């Protein structure tokens, strides 16, 4: 690999169940860093424990995005859309803000504006076409999983604002899907979907927003929209997430530590802080003259 001496960067090709398992169990490897599902992360931890390897895990997420009624409304709508359906990833990003909580005083207004944002900015098509903003899902298995979760939302009584089905008759394309009137125990609220599906629910107070945001087994990312910076920092302190954006979403910088709380992982990637996970601390004591 360009820029590195021979032998520093080595690539082992193969499927995770074979190549990944062998790497995790190998006694000559001291450190494992993994990005992927929570289930796979747990498996890696078990195998790594046999040789007491150090592990860094960045796993699942179900990130909240909170919009207060004193936020810059237009920007909040655009960033909220970006957080789940923007950037050309169709929700296929671990920090996707797939749970949007909007203060009840602007809830209906936000729903209308978000719906319009989806309609006006969605161009479904070939991902290699520069005009396309919404491409296919990564695989047939993921495509089917997303549609199954969307159907569960319908059957559990969530209100479908837009989307909710396949797009076209070719490829693994799914319509941008927005649910309203959801309940905390619904699958679409609790499970990571990893697709273009978002739930939008109202909240009343600051404490209510924090409680709803933390009502998840994950804690990877969160976003907060308010013009009151003191309030933003209070909420950021109360939200259980490794990364918190204030008045933005998904704009993580490579120099800033990244990782999660709870089932979203262990340790941090990126930034100088992450380098410590690849080092060992050694204490060397030198006797400068003490005699026994």
What do these predicted ranges mean?
Residues 17-18, 39-40, 50, 230-231, ...:
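Short alpha-helical
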Residues 20-24, 210:
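Short hydrophobic/charged patches on amphipathic alpha-helices used for structural packing
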Residues 1-20:
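PLP-dependent aminotransferase-like
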Residues 22-23, 152, 187, 277:
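Well-formed, non-transmembrane alpha-helical positions, independent of function
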Residues 25, 31, 37-183, 246, ...:
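ALDH superfamily catalytic-core signature
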Residues 29, 66, 119, 166, ...:
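Conserved C-terminal structural/oligomerization subdomain of aldehyde/semialdehyde dehydrogenase
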Residues 16-19, 61, 204-206:
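Short helix-initiation/N-cap motifs at beta->coil->alpha
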